[in-house]
């Protein structure tokens, strides 16, 4: 079962991506480096719940 998650920027801009994750293969919190257009840099995005 793939669950929807939100990837929030650690730069503090409030920018986020939404994606899906397979909880069986990745039980931990996801961290991925992606582009944040507000700061025009690649920063680490951390997993958060979609409310």
From Swiss-Prot:
Q: Which UniProt keywords apply?
A: Ribonucleoprotein, Ribosomal protein
Q: Name one GO cellular component term.
A: cytosolic large ribosomal subunit
Instruction: Give GO MF terms, alphabetically.
Output: structural constituent of ribosome
Among InterPro entries, the record links this protein to: Ribosomal_bL33, Ribosomal_bL33_CS, Ribosomal_bL33_sf, Ribosomal_zn-bd
- Record-linked Pfam families: Ribosomal_L33 (PF00471)
- GO biological process terms, semicolon-separated: translation
PROSITE patterns registered for this protein in UniProt: RIBOSOMAL_L33
Keyword Nucleus annotated? no
Homology family: Belongs to the bacterial ribosomal protein bL33 family.
Q: What is this protein called?
A: Large ribosomal subunit protein bL33
Source organism per entry reads Psychrobacter arcticus (strain DSM 17307 / VKM B-2377 / 273-4)
């Amino acid at each position: 079962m793939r669950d929807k998650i939100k990837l929030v920027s650690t730069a503090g801009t409030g920018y986020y991506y939404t994606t899906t994750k397979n909880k069986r293969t990745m039980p931990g919190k996801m961290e991925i480096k992606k582009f944040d257009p507000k700061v025009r840099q690649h920063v680490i995005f951390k997993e958060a719940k979609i409310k």
